[in-house]
Every structure is written in structure tokens, then in C-alpha cells.
Amino acid sequence: MFDINLTHEQQQKAVEQIQELMAQGISSGEAIQIVAKALREIHKNDKKTPEN
């Protein structure tokens, strides 16, 4: 596993996404997994982008 540093705003958005998934009936653990996986994918793709 690797660490992803998120801004406060990004953390808030992640919490909101988790809460939305839970409101749709998804368990908290599964909601966290879904959001964490999405964040890892975004972070991985950001790392691949060449810096200017």
C-alpha cells in the first residue's frame, strides 16, 4: 500500500462520497474501499503525467 496525501478539501469530498454510497445502502467498509480505490487510481494516473 502507498500513502496518498490529500488536502482538507479532497478529504471532505471523499467523506461526502462515502456518505452518499452509504445512503444508497452500501456498507461503510465497502464504501470506503470504493472511494479509496478511486483515489488510488487518480493518484496513480497523476504520477504518470509528465511534469512541466
UniProtKB/Swiss-Prot annotation:
**Family that this chain belongs to:** Belongs to the UPF0181 family.
Q: What is this protein called?
A: UPF0181 protein HI_1434.2
